[in-house]
Amino acid sequence: MELLLNKLSTFGNALPGDITQGLIWGIMAIGVFITYKILDFADLTVDGTLGLGGVTAVVLISNGVPVPVAMLIAFLAGCMAGLCTALLNTMLGIPGILAGILTQLALYSVYLDINGKANAPISVDKFPLVISSRYVTAGNEVVDIICTVGTALLFVVLIIAALYWFFGTEYGMAIRATGCNSSMSKAEGINTKRTTIVALVLSNGFVGLAGALLAQYQGFADVNMGRGAIVIGLAAVIIGMVLGEVILRKRFNFIGKLSFTVIGAIVYFVVLRIVMLIGLSTDNTKMFSAIIVALFLAVPYIQKTSKTSFRKAGKRAANAAIDEAEHLGAALANSVNSPKKEGK
């Protein structure tokens, strides 16, 4: 009993940090949502873009650049990474997955060129960082915890509001149409290459911004901080889509999808914390992430096949009932006609 209470206490103390981390990674997941769900483009650039945004912000802040300006430049650095992938795909005809891998590999070298070493630390004691994990650990004032979580939430709300507005415009609808049916979009006169470029630029811009926030939150940027980011992003998107469809059903609109993508990231980190408290080694977190993605990816397929099976079973039962009714009808008709024949 005491062990259980200790674990619950540990979970409660870690929960604000997990929520904050989920909100930050949720911004990255929104970037993945733009390419994966809206554009239908498998973009692997994000593993490199996250680290690029982080190191850009850390190096600039360390050299006296105001934090908001450093974060804006990190966003633009992410946009440039997305532009590279987009140009490789649209102008050179390189498949999307390969284009993302090539850019991702190049970004590791860019990271080292910017920082000169694999790790770039930054302290909240020396610089006025926007967010820091120091304020969400056990022992801090409730006000500090609320302000830290609220800061991350404010970024999320502003980004969702901006994207909801943008994808409701004519150009945003053109991007969505490109993802739905590229051939039909071309027939309607939409420049699909341009919409692909804009979507990838926007997506990686938000990933770069998430990297800047994450580096400030954890107190450092690392060349490997983005490794496996695409898995976490996909996990957040898939978890969010499944939860949204279950909870909202027919009311699951575009803004709901954006919101539940972030909720999916929070759920991911909370579940990860629970599993770690149970006793899973931190060395197995990547494997656990892959299992989560696989399970949630399988949910729509299982639902579809189960519905199909139920439909087939229903049809078989209906056909059997019809056959039985016809058989009974024929039997009754024979029994009615038999006395008449005997009377004659």
How would you name each of these model-derived features?
Residues 36-91, 139-142, 246-250, 277:
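Membrane-embedded helix boundary and interhelical linker motif in transport proteins
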Residues 1-28, 56, 63-69, 141-145, ...:
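Membrane-interfacial amphipathic/re-entrant helices at transmembrane-helix boundaries
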Residues 81, 145-230, 234-235:
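Helix-loop-helix "hairpin" substructures at the membrane interface of multi-pass membrane proteins
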